[in-house]
Each structure stands twice: as structure tokens, then as C-alpha cells.
Amino acid sequence: MELGCWTQLGLTFLQLLLISSLPREYTVINEACPGAEWNIMCRECCEYDQIECVCPGKKEVVGYTIPCCRNEENECDSCLIHPGCTIFENCKSCRNGSWGGTLDDFYVKGFYCAECRAGWYGGDCMRCGQVLRAPKGQILLESYPLNAHCEWTIHAKPGFVIQLRFVMLSLEFDYMCQYDYVEVRDGDNRDGQIIKRVCGNERPAPIQSTGSSLHVLFHSDGSKNFDGFHAIFEEITACSSSPCFHDGTCVLDKAGSYKCACLAGYTGQRCENLLEERNCSDPGGPVNGYQKITGGPGLINGRHAKIGTVVSFFCNNSYVLSGNEKRTCQQNGEWSGKQPICIKACREPKISDLVRRRVLPIQVQSRETPLHQLYSAAFSKQKLQSAPTKKPALPFGDLPMGYQHLHTQLQYECISPFYRRLGSSRRTCLRTGKWSGQAPSCIPICGKIENVTAPKTQGLRWPWQAAIYRRTSGVHDGSLHKGAWFLVCSGALVNERTVVVAAHCVTDLGKVTMIKTADLKVILGKFYRDDDRDEKTTQSLRISAIILHPNYDPILLDADIAILKLLDKARISTRVQPICLAASRDLSTSFQESHITVAGWNVLADVRSPGFKNDTLRSGVVSVVDSLLCEEQHEDHGIPVSVTDNMFCASQDPTAPSDICTAETGGIAAVSFPGRASPEPRWHLMGLVSWSYDKTCSHRLSTAFTKVLPFKDWIERNMK
């Protein structure tokens, strides 16, 4: 029996908890309840209870009904605990339920008041407080119930403060203001510093915030209530009271305080003091320079300047101004700033981003001439000791950015080991205002690969090797879709913006019509034939122009050479470097005796073959074949060819290892020998694969190359 009672009490308590958390419209259906709005509260409703009240505002009779249920002892209990008439406590005018004997949901919905007193809102008029953002306004709280709690936050525009004035105050009085009170805090929350706490009916002096926000809290306890309070607020500034005298202008600062900008003849924090009119004496121009009046009223009698006069200073050629460029005559008769001086100096020479500059400590240099030696011998050691030579004075005065003192030395070096310097490594500022030596520049080091010999070239990453790609205009061999890129040739990078390539690679077959630059691109830093293998180290560069040699013959492939100008500079690194261009006088041996290394990718490789993913840049050594022998060799195979002076033939060197088939690889030919710029071996571009009739890579027929030596001057002219 006791267990059943406790279970029933628990269920009833759970029902009461559910009442407060129900949504406005119920969805649970209990057929035993009188109305759907009650079905979650009771077991089996059988009766109702009538609550009769008097509205405190207009004194009319109002009320509502709630259902009642029979308990186990057949006693009638209300289905929920209700506060009776206190729900109308703060209403100015009340709403009325259908309490004349019909069940309703009036109490459940919570809209008891038809009208609230000023400052209150909500269905029971018990809610108050808000966030106020306005230049002025009011806070009005008409009467108040017990245990009320209201908060207002007032925000002003930046740079303004808030002033709060109480128009009416009627609260329970206490010396400590601990029962019913209004508390004003600086800031926008209850953590701010308390400015004032008020109660009773004595209005305080106007309250002002230090910042742009103010927090107002109203609190009432559980006994006694009065008429409430009425306060007005407005945005003000420190300049609102016009604190400046003599028509001075009040200027606000970021902290919210003010400063007075005084008219001429007045001074003081509030422009309260009258100044005697003063003048400034002529400051004069600096040595090796001059002055000009550039503003204000100017000079009086050519010797004194009126207050507000602005003087600008300038220096003669090869001198630089150190100090204030302008000075203004102030109201105290003094010039602003300090008098500048003109110093011998040099403007720093412009350098490229590839050059690193370092300013050396200033040391006055000295020279000895035969005349110095004559004077040293003519005077005794004693006289020299009695009249010691003074050390030259070091430069003084600060210079504007971009200038250096006389005798300053600048040291230059390249920012990367892949570049070499041209011009002077050290330059000195001369008395003429110019710099000694020649302007430095850094250019990429060409043809340098560490520890590489000609016979052992397989598996090398040739950093000047450029892959030339063309965009398809239709289906190609059934494996490329429209717009895909495919490898057509190899070229040679000769500087950061120039690639040398065979002309037939960038023209329509058998014609001199050049392919559109938008349908060509250059890939640098590539090693694997598969385009997906080197994507982190490669550079994909667009082409701005194609320069075809004017003597190019698309039938005989004579002068088969062209230049690609890159739209963007190549980034020089371990994987991307240019190759050198050679002249005939640079060759230590005859051209026919040279062992030439050829490198390139297999442009005819099948992307579906198993080894395609691991196929890399191929290289091998070839030997030059006499031109007449090359022609006869082709005639023996029924192929009449003409080898011009702009070509050379070569075939694979049988004594050197090789993994290249020149007939399948549009590559470049290079030779390593010491250059003029460095005694170390450098790789030089000698040729470009032009044509071959060897279809089986049997090496019975030589491959023809475009000889680069005759075109060296033409290439260098177009590299600039």
C-alpha cells in the first residue's frame, strides 16, 4: 500500500514538472480529460475549480477555471498547483477567462494582462528591462511588484558618454539601500564599477559614465512596493559644456577628454590666457643649401617672420638634407624643430632582387704617393711626433632613407649560389655624390652540374632540359581527349625567360605557320616521362612569344631553330638552371672530335605500357659523323638527304653506355668543357635533334641535329 502511494505521488510530481515544460499546443491525447489542453496534467478529470479575482488596475471581477480530479479517496483535487489571483498582480487592465462554468486554457497560455504599466511587458506584465541604443531616451518603471528584478543597458556612440538624470524616484527607503533600489554601474554589465545606488524619494545629482555604456539595475524585495522611478538619459561629450574661452575650438581625443584649439594670440588649456604678439628671427639657410618661405604670412622687413610662417630647406647638388625639412614660427617666438644641415652623401644605387647589399663600417681610406715619402724623409722623427696627424672626422648627422655618407662602402653578393655576380663587388661613395665602380647584377650560372663526366650520364636530371607541350585540338591516337596536353619536344633553357627549341616543334608540319602560344607551354624541372611524378618540383610556364629564325626551311629543315620567350621568369634552383652557349673559339678540340651528350624524353612512349610510370629523362653519348658520309649513308638506304652547314650528323657512340634513341626523342645535344667565365667544366648547348629516318633505333642511320654555333649571335640578341 505504501509503495503504491509513493508511486502515485511520484507520478503526480512528474506531471507537475511536465506542465512548465509543455509547448503552447499539446499533441498528447488523453480521452479522459475534458479538453486536449489538460490531458498531460491529470489522470481522469471529472470536475473544475473556479478562481475568482479582482483586477488591481480597474477593479473589475475577473477569473479563470482549472480542472479538478478525484483522487483514490474520491476527494476532488486540483490538477495543478496554481497561484490564484497573484497572476493579475502587476496588470493595469486584465484579461478574463471563461470562468462562468466552462473549462478553458486561460491559465496555461499565460496571457493574463490586457495592458501593462509603463516599463513592464509580457503576458503577466512581470518582464522589464532592455538594451537601449539612442542619443537620448527614458527609463520609466510605473509601480512594481514584490521580488522584481530589471536590467537596462544604455549604449552611446564611440567618443560619447552617457548622462542619466532622475525625474521621479519613489522606492522603499533604507539608509543602506538594501531592500528596493536602483543601482547604476559604469560599463555594460553587472561587473562594472558602481557609480551610484539610490532608494527612497530623494533624487540624486546627474550621473555620468566614463565610457560609452551604462548599466542600470532595479531590485525589489519581498515586502512593500511604491510608485517606481523615471529617469532620462542622453549622449554628451566633454565639449558639450563649451569649455574653451575666446572662441577656441573644443576637440575630443580618443580617451573622451578634450583639448582646446586656440585662436592666434591665446593660449592655455582652455584658451584663457592672452599672448603678446611675437615674431621669429630669420633662421637662415644651411651651409651648402638654401631656404624658401612656403607658407604663412611671411617675413617682416625681410628679417623677422610672423607667427605661422613656414620655411622649407633645400640642399645643393651632391648634398642631402639632414634634419627637419620644414620649420614653423610658433606663438612663443621660436621655430619648431631644429635647424637642418646639408651633408655630402650619395643616393643608394638601385639593385635587383637577386643582389644582396651590405653596408660596411665607415673607414676613411688613405693613399701614399711619392710625395708622401718625400715629406716623410725630409722631416725628422722628432718633429713628426711633436705634430701628430689628426684622424679625419667621421660623417655626422642622420640621412634620409636611401642615402649613404661620404666614403661609405657597399658590398654586394648574389642571394643564391646558383647565380654569379657581374659588376663591382664593392662600391664607395665619392665626393661627387656618385658611386665608384659599376652597378652589380646577378645572372644564373650556366651549365653547371657537380661531379658529372660525359660517359656516365644515365639517370641524370639535366636542369636546363625543357619539356615542350602542345594542346590537342581533337582526338589523338584515341588516347587523348580534346584540349589535353601532350609532350612534343625538348628544348634548352638559356636564361630565365628564354628557351631554345627546334623550329619544327612549334610550327605546323611542312609550314612556317607558328602554333598559337596559348596552345604551347614549357615545363621545367621535369625528370619522369609521366606528368604526375614530378608535380612538386616542376614549373609550368606560359609562352609570351615565338621567334622563328628567318632562314628556317620547313622542307629541308635548314636553320631548324626557334626561341620561346616565357611570360614569367623561371625560378632558378637545383632542378632548374640554364645551359651555356658556346662559340667556335671556345672548343678545345675540333667539333668532329667532340663527344656530345644527347638528352630527351621518349615522345612516342605509350602511356598504357607497364613501364611508362617509371620512364625518365634519357641520355647517351653520340659521335659526330662526317656530313658527306651521312648523306651517302642515307643514299644507301634509298633516302636522299641534304646536310647543310647549319646541321651535323651524329650516331651513338658504341663505347659509351646509353639508354636513348634519338629517332624517338626530340632532345638537345650538349658538350662539357671549361668556359671563359670559369675554369671549371661547363655544359654548352651544341645542337637540337632535327630529323632522323631510323625507325627502329638500330643506329644504322645517323640522326641530324641543328648546329647551334652558327646561331649564337642571333640567340643572344633575342635573349635580352
Swiss-Prot record:
Glycans are attached at residues 451, 614. Residues 445-720 form the Peptidase S1 domain. InterPro entries: CUB_dom, EGF-like_Ca-bd_dom, EGF-like_dom, Peptidase_S1_PA, Peptidase_S1_PA_chymotrypsin, Peptidase_S1A, Serine_Protease_S1-Domain, Sperma_CUB_dom_sf. It is found in: Secreted. Keywords: Disulfide bond, EGF-like domain, Glycoprotein, Repeat, Secreted, Serine protease homolog, Signal, Sushi. GO terms for cellular component: extracellular region. Residues 1-21 form the signal peptide. One of its GO terms (molecular function) is calcium ion binding. SUPFAM superfamilies: Complement control module/SCR domain, EGF/Laminin, Spermadhesin, CUB domain, Trypsin-like serine proteases. Residues 128-236 form the CUB domain. Disulfide bonds join 128-150, 177-199, 239-250, 244-260, 262-271, 280-329, 315-342, 414-442, 489-505, 630-649, 661-697. Its main location: secreted. Residues 235-272 form the EGF-like domain. Belongs to the peptidase S1 family. May play a role in regeneration of skeletal muscle. PANTHER family: INACTIVE SERINE PROTEASE PAMR1, PROTHROMBIN. This is Inactive serine protease PAMR1. It comes from Pongo abelii (Sumatran orangutan).
